[in-house]
Amino acid sequence: MEVNAGGVIAYISSSSSASSPASCHSEGSENSFQSSSSSVPSSPNSSNSDTNGNPKNGDLANIEGILKNDRIDCSMKTSKSSAPGMTKSHSGVTKFSGMVLLCKVCGDVASGFHYGVHACEGCKGFFRRSIQQNIQYKKCLKNENCSIMRMNRNRCQQCRFKKCLSVGMSRDAVRFGRIPKREKQRMLIEMQSAMKTMMNSQFSGHLQNDTLVEHHEQTALPAQEQLRPKPQLEQENIKSSSPPSSDFAKEEVIGMVTRAHKDTFMYNQEQQENSAESMQPQRGERIPKNMEQYNLNHDHCGNGLSSHFPCSESQQHLNGQFKGRNIMHYPNGHAICIANGHCMNFSNAYTQRVCDRVPIDGFSQNENKNSYLCNTGGRMHLVCPMSKSPYVDPHKSGHEIWEEFSMSFTPAVKEVVEFAKRIPGFRDLSQHDQVNLLKAGTFEVLMVRFASLFDAKERTVTFLSGKKYSVDDLHSMGAGDLLNSMFEFSEKLNALQLSDEEMSLFTAVVLVSADRSGIENVNSVEALQETLIRALRTLIMKNHPNEASIFTKLLLKLPDLRSLNNMHSEELLAFKVHP
């Protein structure tokens, strides 16, 4: 199936409305101020889930109770008073359905929606000054664990600034200022519409193609198989794909999900690990500055790279389909096809790993690396380990960079789709609900999967190309809060030392969430979710009988993932608007 460029990024919003991801932030943060009044919402979306389906702190107890929470569907607007029923009084107090909204940083009365969250005037001004003046605050004397409240918010400025970032205040919102309302609405409507169309096309295509394959296999069955009564066939199909209940032990659920996870994810990871030993990049190594140094000869295997890439017959066939494009193979088994600055990825399902990678020239000891890394004309970087490289060619347009970044997700997204289809009971959901779950949860699944790419001990991040970069190098390229938050999440998740089985079940729980926006048959999704959570609980209790807190810690990772999803959405939007 042909995938449109940029289509794999549309999981950043599962809402059909023209809405800004930057206006939606997760309430699921243990740093959020919620203690003053449990009945007062701190978001314009006064519901158990925002547009991306983010659970709030108050829902964590319900999540442990197999997520028996209420849901209210809300839609975002592009203006500051984004939710229906939200008003702003003459005194500057923001209210929602008659209830006063509180500042997410200090708990004071919020004056409005500032820099991505509801905040008071004090915290709004504090955050703006901190960013604009690049203030370095005095080190906290309490290990950066100060509790920020209205009465003591000026006591520790470092912790206050940290709290601003943790609840979702956006540096970019301060840096870029305001976009005219009409222009912002036009851009958002245009972008969201295109993203939704392409995403629906991609996910629906994956699911429909799988259905066609199954139909073809069924027609190829022996005659005696085709002549069997339909009710019997239907009964067996239902039995094999329905959510396991009393007929299936929880151990069988665990086994099925673990096999699905291993077959779709772990193989590629092992390939990457095996190749990393022989192709370990040196510190400071980089992608070639000018990709045009390779000969674009259309008549040779690898399109001018035959001297470096010995190719098989299947690879020759692949190159014939994409004639006129450079094809480079990276250690994780993905072939990057470069054509006129655009990238397309092909996973191991399409091509064999039979090509060696061209050695990449590194920096000399005396070369000024920072001047090279930052010489992009002041443009933004998409420094995200889910792209093939943090390097941004200064000669490429923002549109080209966006397409490259989008297409780098294609193999990973396809693996998520394949994993989802093998979760017992997932295929029984309506195709509409399957697509919505995949759109809303793909980034979070990838975040769990790629947590192993973050090495807290070495302070390095491995990108999808298989190359490692130090955190300091990435910061010099423009990496900011998103990378820091991803690193922090990965460090905490890796610290739990989950087994393959536990990671598989947790990944399934992350994907199948009944509180996602746009779900039609909530009861069916909730039943499947309940089955998976019970299986995860059983597995954790079995493997860690003396560490019951691990299950709770895993559930607490769900709102953290929602926050990361929103931050990622905001960064993508900021890049799209200001490349």
Swiss-Prot record:
Residues 227-237 have a biased composition (Basic and acidic residues). Residues 13-54 have a biased composition (Low complexity). Residues 1-99 are annotated as: Modulating. PROSITE patterns: NR_LBD, NUCLEAR_REC_DBD_1, NUCLEAR_REC_DBD_2. GO terms for cellular component: chromatin; cytoplasm; nucleoplasm; nucleus. InterPro entries: NHR-like_dom_sf, Nucl_hrmn_rcpt_lig-bd, Nuclear_hormone_rcpt_NR1, Nuclear_hrmn_rcpt, Znf_hrmn_rcpt, Znf_NHR/GATA. Heme binds at residues 384, 568. Residues 1-60 are annotated as: Required for phosphorylation by CSNK1E and cytoplasmic localization. GO terms for biological process: cell differentiation; circadian behavior; energy homeostasis; hormone-mediated signaling pathway; intracellular receptor signaling pathway; lipid homeostasis; negative regulation of DNA-templated transcription; negative regulation of inflammatory response. Residues 397-579 are annotated as: Interaction with ZNHIT1. Residues 369-579 form the NR LBD domain. GO terms for molecular function: DNA-binding transcription factor activity, RNA polymerase II-specific; DNA-binding transcription repressor activity, RNA polymerase II-specific; nuclear receptor activity; RNA polymerase II cis-regulatory region sequence-specific DNA binding; sequence-specific double-stranded DNA binding; zinc ion binding. It comes from the Eukaryota. It is found in: Nucleus; Cytoplasm. The modification Phosphoserine is found at residue 46. A zinc finger (NR C4-type) spans 103-123, 140-164. Keywords: Acetylation, Activator, Biological rhythms, Cytoplasm, Disulfide bond, DNA-binding, Heme, Iron, Metal-binding, Nucleus, Phosphoprotein, Receptor, Repressor, Transcription, Transcription regulation, Ubl conjugation, Zinc, Zinc-finger. Residues 100-176 bind DNA. Binds DNA as a monomer or a homodimer. Interacts with NCOA5 coactivator, leading to a strong increase of transcription of target genes. Interacts (via N-terminus) with KAT5. Interacts (via C-terminus) with HDAC1. Interacts with ZNHIT1. Interacts with SIAH2. Transcriptional repressor which coordinates circadian rhythm and metabolic pathways in a heme-dependent manner. Integral component of the complex transcription machinery that governs circadian rhythmicity and forms a critical negative limb of the circadian clock by directly repressing the expression of core clock components BMAL1 and CLOCK. Also regulates genes involved in metabolic functions, including lipid metabolism and the inflammatory response. Acts as a receptor for heme which stimulates its interaction with the NCOR1/HDAC3 corepressor complex, enhancing transcriptional repression. This is Nuclear receptor subfamily 1 group D member 2. The gene is NR1D2.
